[in-house]
């Protein structure tokens, strides 16, 4: 089977399944993924958000269309799910056997609404059906044709009701929300109702193709870098579990069986995207696999996103530690010169209150002159460096301290400030204030920046540039199309990468100010 062909087939199926349904393409794609992987999926959401429609449309992608749909209640019986007992068999042959045609054991697509209302006898039979794809019908063991089990509810299973085992069997867990975008909502109101879709015969998934896919998915490689990312996720989940006092030990627990099925899901994603191995673009699918409670969705998404960039963050951390070590070991020589009082007339004044710093390699930079008197020689003061559009330049100011200083600045804008003769020390690099023609005496030293680090230390900048390139390359990979990663999930990744990029840029700027 050609990898390119399978991807085009899946892409077209997702498009057709999603026709006339708004903001649900990710649910259709993940439901298709789970069915082809032979796994189950749980849809969480209020009534009227398209959960049952997804199951009905999924049925249409298979050549053999057999669907069973049922709304559970506390009074539901096994007869209603698995079929009524055959009276004739019981009477004539003394055999307890169900007539399964038209019921769950007969269907290849099953949709069970309000799943958690099922009684213990139904739950036990479902566990076997999900785990082993078999159903014990009297003396006969039936191999189930079920390709997809889709369950739905507007709530999660309640604790201490014995539902944990059944809940663990739903590998994919997707939240179904009402339409969020108002323009999309208007399109839905104006659009024609289209309850059924027509799938061209050549796109239908036959039993033969389905079996072939399952076999070929087993050969999809799991690279070492993906295994390391998974190890990172496992460690982080355990750390979060131990640190979050508001959660129970099971809130972040992922069983070995669940991990095995999760990786099988990633292998299926890789295959259906036309690849021979799992890559980074598959990992965001774990957003919808590793959470156990609504409260853990956000932490889990954060951990999975971190797993995409942990090696880059580690490299940044190593550079930062080396930089900080250099600051400590190379001393405070720049601040030890004798400090004299300054006269504002000795310096050129800009924008009424600012003087210009010389030698900055990131652009014109202005220092709020009144802050000079608050700076100390041997103790760092927190400052802020930011770009002012009105002044078309960078501004450095002291961050006021005290009970009334409530304004907070992003971490990448924070710098350390110290006082020096005729200038200020920013992140341990001296920048002289621009002297005026009226200066009463020469300002020492006469040049702009005095370097704390030598030119031999430029390897830190080179390392940061390599890290920046690696981050850009990783984002280019992550932005490649994956049929089962939504634009919403991709935005989460992009936002995280942007923040990481700013953090790296801030560190690089700190280093540059010291070289």
Where are each of the predicted segments found?
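Conserved alpha-helical scaffold flanking the Walker A/P-loop in AAA+ ATPase domains
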Residues: 30-34, 87-110
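Conserved C-terminal "switch" segment of AAA+ ATPases
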Residues: 3-7, 20-21, 159, 174-247, ...
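Canonical AAA+ ATPase core
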Residues: 88-93, 109-122, 128-205, 214
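Pre-Walker A (pre-P-loop) alpha-helix and adjacent loop at the N terminus of AAA/AAA+ ATPase modules
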Residues: 4-46
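Terminal-proximal interaction/regulatory segments of ATP-powered molecular machines
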Residues: 298-515
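Walker A/P-loop
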Residues: 32-74
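C-terminal helical "lid" subdomain and adjoining coupling/linker elements of P-loop NTPases
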Residues: 219-221, 236-311
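Conserved NTP-binding/hydrolysis module of P-loop NTPases
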Residues: 74-94
